[in-house]
């Protein structure tokens, strides 16, 4: 028997993190997954699938994913049931995730800004050890006319 589910979609809400009585972290969220075909109006419909994830991965999901985040989920399909306050039997189908892939950075603007700041700091650090000479952006900025190069001057 095989019970394997692989999904890629966007979160419809922020993950909800809770802890069981035995101390296990559990996160839940809903993933919107587009169908591969279009309806009569030419629009793609989506399925909204409940996802449950446990332990350390639940903490990571809560920390790094939010509404609108693109995520990949690998897990198994599970149906559970319970009796509601009115005495009716309620069935819930959800995916129990074995693995969650974060398919985009939490905030790409922050990440790009951090990388830029690191590069600036590295450049400043290098200039301290090169006789404090400023690095010119364009070494040919003061050239008056064409620059002559021979094939022997090229490193390739």
From Swiss-Prot:
Name of the gene: ssb
UniProt entry keywords in alphabetical sequence: DNA damage, DNA recombination, DNA repair, DNA replication, DNA-binding
Placement of sequence motif Important for interaction with partner proteins: 151-156
Top-level taxon of origin: Bacteria
CDD domains: SSB_OBF (cd04496)
UniProt function note: Plays an important role in DNA replication, recombination and repair. Binds to ssDNA and to an array of partner proteins to recruit them to their sites of action during DNA metabolism.
Quaternary structure (record): Homotetramer.
Any GO MF annotation of the entry: single-stranded DNA binding
Any one annotated GO CC term: nucleoid
Region of interest (Disordered), residue spans: 104-156
Pfam family, one: SSB
Gene Ontology biological process: DNA recombination; DNA repair; DNA replication
InterPro entries (alphabetical): NA-bd_OB-fold, Primosome_PriB/ssb, ssDNA-bd
Protein name (record): Single-stranded DNA-binding protein 1
Amino acid composition bias (Low complexity), ranges on this chain: 112-128
Domain SSB intervals: 1-104
Record PANTHER family: SINGLE-STRANDED DNA-BINDING PROTEIN
